[in-house]
Amino acid sequence: MLGKRAKAEKCDAIDGILEESESLLEDFGGTAAGDAAIIFSCQAVEHYEITRYGSMSAFADALGMDEAKAHLETILDQESAADSKLSELAEDTINDAAAEYDEDESEHA
C-alpha cells in the first residue's frame, strides 16, 4: 500500500506488559485469580494496540490516505471487539471466581 516493507521493531511497552503478566502468573497461576490476570494482561495489550491503530488511522486521515485509513479502521474495530469479548468474559465468569479465591486466601492468612 505504501510501497515499503514492514519491519519488526521491539516494543518496550508490550515487553513490560508481558513481564508483569509472567510475574502475576508466578504468583497466581492455575487459579481463578491467575485467569483474571491473564485477561487483564490481554486487555492491556489490546488497549495499547487500540491506541496505536487509532493514532495511525488519524494520521492516515490527515494525510489523505483513505485506503490506509480504511484498513486501519478495520483493524481497530477488530481490536475493540477483542477487548469487549475479554471484558465480557471477565465480567460474566472470571472476576467473581477470582474474588472468591481472594476471600478464601484472606480467610486462611
Model-derived segments and their meaning:
Residues 95-109:
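Acidic, carboxylate-rich catalytic segments that either coordinate divalent cations
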Residues 1, 82-90:
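Amphipathic alpha-helical coiled-coil segments
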Residues 1-17:
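Conserved alpha-helical segments that form or flank metal/cofactor-binding pockets of metalloenzymes
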Residues 1, 20-24, 78:
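Solvent-exposed, charged/polar functional surfaces in cytosolic regulatory/catalytic domains
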Residues 7, 73-76, 82-83, 108-109:
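Metal- and O2-centered redox machinery and metal/ROS homeostasis
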Residues 31, 89-93:
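Short, structured secondary-structure boundary patches
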Residues 12-73:
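Acidic/histidine-rich alpha-helical segments that form the ligand environment
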